[in-house]
Amino acid sequence: MTTGFAAKDDVFARDILSVAQLNQAVGQLMERSIPPLWVRGEVSNFTQAASGHWYFTLKDAGAAVRTVMFRGRASMVGFVPRPGDEVEIRGRVSLYEPRGDYQLQADAMRRAGVGNLFEAFSRLKDKLASEGLFDASRKRVPLRLPRAIGVVTSLQAAALRDVLSALARRAPQVEIVIYPAPVQGADAASRLAAQVRQASARREVDTLLLVRGGGSIEDLWSFNDEDLARAVADCAIPVISGVGHETDFTIADFVADLRAPTPTAAAELACVPRAELLSALGHAASRLSRAQQRRLDLAAQRLDRASAQLVSPAQRLAHQCERLNTLRHRLAASAQRPLAASAARLTGLAQRLARRAPQTARVQDRVQSLAQRLLRGQQAGLAERGVRLQALAAQLRALDPEHTLARGYAVLRDAQGRVVSNASALVVGEGVRIDLAQGRVQADITDVQPRR
């Protein structure tokens, strides 16, 4: 990457250059000749200025180069490098003209080896995606009102404290089961996968949270493990992941049924706030009360209409007695009519016989005797029918409920207004209504003794 000075270049065509002109020309030459590139080295002499800019030296065993990273780019790195850190920097070579020192002006930084990790991440992501493990059709919706929530994380993790605090605040009634496992380290991924499988096998929780706090890509790498991803995909319980911060994505996030940006957010997604639940229950109770009141009002209206149409037993009895008297008069009248007609015919025959044969006085006497016997028979029959009518009237009065109540009896009705005739139809504590001859009484059943 060598560049010669052109003899006819405007700057170098002059016989004598100032130092500033020289440095400016060299700086322009370097910027044109060397494209942006990646450089790997060790951080030393790191300084973070009050302005937010980073100044440090990037070195290896054989050389060193001054490096600067301005505040806007430094804020996007995601970590603050420390002396001794191996990093990979993307930047361009520039010349600091006041001193004539060349430097590396960085616009991106990552920890050394992150490129390999990202490639491994991408390969695993593509593999699992091709198997359908990320498909939306596989995702399950966590229960809105879980009975118990499981948490897979480290017992020492700040994420666990955040989750417990959020759940205690939002849903103190929910039981919490912790499945402890390290969240970083050599065996973290396998132990996390084992706890997910254990929670799936036990089925003692309704929702499972897989959480840890933020960190570097190396700190979060356990959650990019294939075995853990398959354990989450095979879990019989809906899984909510909350790993790192909002900008962090892991393979576990893609496989989980629901991804939360933080552990606290995962806890919030796992349950409905108690206040919201109580409010919803209050609204539901109000709607139920209004609906029940409407039903009671309609039932009361129907009862009023039915009561208006219902004839009391006394009225029914009076109506029947009136009808009975009418029938009795009609019966008496119908019995007298044929009797009077027969007597008139006999009298007419007797008169005709008397005119034609005075000697038939004996026959006339006999006819009169028969007429009297017929009259007595008709009267006896009428009397017998009158006695039967009186007996029927007495029976009708005996069956009158008002008459029965007047003798000291009572009618017992249940809460629905039905007449109760069997003690076994009642239960202790049930409300009943007792109808008396004068008024009614409400009572509660304290003892039931069926007839043996």
Swiss-Prot record:
One of its GO terms (biological process) is DNA catabolic process. It comes from the Bacteria. One of its GO terms (molecular function) is exodeoxyribonuclease VII activity. InterPro entries: Exonuc_VII_L, Exonuc_VII_lsu_C, OB-fold_nuc-bd_dom. Its EC number is 3.1.11.6. It catalyses: Exonucleolytic cleavage in either 5'- to 3'- or 3'- to 5'-direction to yield nucleoside 5'-phosphates. It is found in: Cytoplasm. GO terms for cellular component: cytoplasm; exodeoxyribonuclease VII complex. Keywords: Cytoplasm, Exonuclease, Hydrolase, Nuclease. CDD domains: ExoVII_LU_OBF. Belongs to the XseA family. Heterooligomer composed of large and small subunits. HAMAP family: Exonuc_7_L. PANTHER family: EXODEOXYRIBONUCLEASE 7 LARGE SUBUNIT (PTHR30008:SF0). Bidirectionally degrades single-stranded DNA into large acid-insoluble oligonucleotides, which are then degraded further into small acid-soluble oligonucleotides. This is Exodeoxyribonuclease 7 large subunit.
